Amino acid sequence: MDRRVLFASLILFAGGAAGVGVALFAFVGVDDGATEAEIVWESDPVTGDDGSGAVVATMDGDPLVLQSVAANGTRSVRATAVGGGVEWTSPVGTGAGGGAAPADGDGGEAVEAAETSGLVTGTLGGEQVVALTTRSGSLVVFDADDGSERFVVDTGGRSAVRPAIGDVDGDGDAEVVAVSTSGGVLAVDAGGDPVFQSDVGAPIERRPLAIDFSGNKASGDDVTNGVAVVTADGDEHAVRLLDGDGDVRWTATPSVTPLSWRQADSQNGPILALGGTNGNLETLEVADGSTRYEIGLQDLPVAVGDAGPGRVYVGGSGSVWAVSLLDGEVSWKQQFGGDTRVNAPSLGVLGGGDEADPVAINREGDLLVLNRNGGVTARGSVGAVVYASPQFADVTGDGTDELIVVTEDGTAVAVDVSD
């Protein structure tokens, strides 16, 4: 396809009380000069992981793909060295202190066929960990280095909702946050001891966000730590921000029904970006829950991805959008893959550069690497269905990151997009 750029003016108009904007946009065409992506490694497929809950952790420079897997009726977390084999497998324990087994050996006591959430990684007490919750109501945390069980705590209700890791009380140390589907919110420290446990009085259906904007001074508000949750009571949805003691700081009723959401920083203070089932993007001020803007992206639905300097990147139906965090102005739209749904875009530093570039992959496994102006710098395909966002790690040892994609059958794929 010849490179083409079609420019159109941005049109904003009042659309109800919230002032919904609808945009025409700068459309950036696919560039024939783009690098063709190359698959440099694939793992074996695994049972019990469709890729949506897998994460990547780098230990001493070596990347591990961490997945929740099922084998012989037992749910486990498995770590696979990128470019190598299985490093450890740890059964999802019941708190009996079960440890990891190298490769596919047996570990400690396990929950039979436990239904679990997606995984999350972060640093607790100076060590890299991986955490999940179970449907039966446990928060389970492992050391990412060797798979040893760090702690298991009761969430206070049924869960299997992905937890979050961040400094929610502003003390300089990260906590783990888990929710129960009945409305419980639990934050624990690096040892598994409670920081707070609250109940917001309504079902929680989305993963919590660990709000940590301690270094932000733009908002003029010194309370930029806490936990954000989305609750649903029938057709009514609400966003609540809890402070570091578990008290509700504010409650907001967004115009959109949130399908995905992220936190992001901006020159005017931190915000929560909500992708609605109606195709609208709505942002709420972390300071007080007020709506900064709502804009229709002409896609249904939209998946909110990573945010970079001044922008948030959103996946739609065959589209990637770059939207200003300040006012909702659409900077550009890139189309690919027809009407195939695009997963939430990620930001990563690739090819030895010093700026993070947006990367998107759609449900058919087609991927694009874009620059800040929406131009395509690399493209390719992993040849399989993908439900998750791309992740990043240095696979080849050349000092630059490659893409890590996990497909619907649990196969981890490393993709080189360098020139």
Stretches found by the model and what they are:
Residues 1-419:
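Hydrophobic alpha-helical segments
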